[in-house]
Amino acid sequence: MQTINTFSWINQRITRSISVLLLVYIITRTSISSAYPIFAQRGYENPREATGRIVCANCHLANKPVDIEVPQAVLPDTVFEAVVRIPYDSQLKQVLSNGKKGGLNVGAVIILPEGFELAPPDRLSPQMKEKIGNLSFQNYRPNQKNIIVVGPVPGQKYSEITFPILSPDPATKKDAHFLKYPIYVGGNRGRGQIYPDGSKSNNTFYSATAAGIVSKIIRKEKGGYEITITDASDSHQVVEIIPPGPELLVSEGEYLKFDQPLTSNPNVGGFGQGDGEIVLQDPLRVQGLLFFLASVILAQIFLVLKKKQFEKVQLAEMNL
C-alpha cells in the first residue's frame, strides 16, 4: 500500500513538472514571437524621428524596398485599403535565433494622419476580410490610433499586407480637415542585426575587437565558436564569442587586424520605408464638381441641338 502511494506521489510530481515546463515554454515562445514590434514600442515614443527616419532602421541595418498603395482621395467616415508590399525572394532562408535556417518573417508600421485609424471589424466587407486573413493589428500606443503595427508574420503568406483604414469625419472630429495628407510606412523582412540594448544578434557579421594571432578556436557543442586572439607584442589574449549562425572566415594561426571580419554576414533581409499621399475629400465639393460637369454636358447638348435647328432653318431658306 505504501509503495502504491509512493508511486502515485512521484507520478503527481512528474505531471506537475511537465505542466510547468510546458507553460513556461508556451509563455516564452509567445513573447519571443511577438516581441519584434514591442522592441520599438518600448524604446521610442514615436516610431518616426524628426529626421523622417523610422526607428526600425536602427535594428534592421540593410536597406530594402517597400511600397504603399492608397486611394488618391477618400470621403469622410469611409473604410479604405492601404496596401503595403514588402518584396523579397521567397526562396531565401534566414538564420534563426538557434542558428538553424528558416523562412523570413515580415512586419510593417504605418503612420497615418491624425484622425485616421484602424477600421473596426464590423465595418469590413467580406472581400476585405479575406485579404486581411489572420493578421492581427495593434496601435503603436493606446492613445496613438493613427500609428498601426503588424508582425512578425510569415513572409511567404504576407509579403503584401492590407491595412483596413477608417477615414475621419470633420463634422464630428474637430481636428480633421479636408486636406491632402502624407502617409508614412516602414516594412522589414527577416530578423534584425542589433537588439535595442545595442547587442548584436546572430543575424549579422562579427569582427575582431583586437589585432593579433588566432591562437585557439573552440567549436561549441550547441553551435557557435570561441576564438582566442593573442597579441604578439604582450601576449594579451582576447576571447571572441560567436553565436551559432554566421560562418567562420578565419583559422588558427592566422594574423588578424583590428576590426577584421571573423564571420560572414548571414543577413538576407532588411528594412525599407516609403510614403504616399491621400486627400480627405469634401462631399459637397464632389457634388459641386458633378453639378458643374453635368451643366457642361447639358450645355454641349443644347449647343448641338441649337446648331442642328439653325442648319435646318438655313436649308429651308435655301430651298425657297
From Swiss-Prot:
Residues 1-35 form the signal peptide. This is Cytochrome f. The gene is petA. GO terms for molecular function: electron transfer activity; heme binding; iron ion binding. It comes from Cuscuta exaltata. The 4 large subunits of the cytochrome b6-f complex are cytochrome b6, subunit IV (17 kDa polypeptide, petD), cytochrome f and the Rieske protein, while the 4 small subunits are PetG, PetL, PetM and PetN. The complex functions as a dimer. It is a single-pass membrane protein. Its cofactor is heme. The chain crosses the membrane at residues 286-306. Belongs to the cytochrome f family.
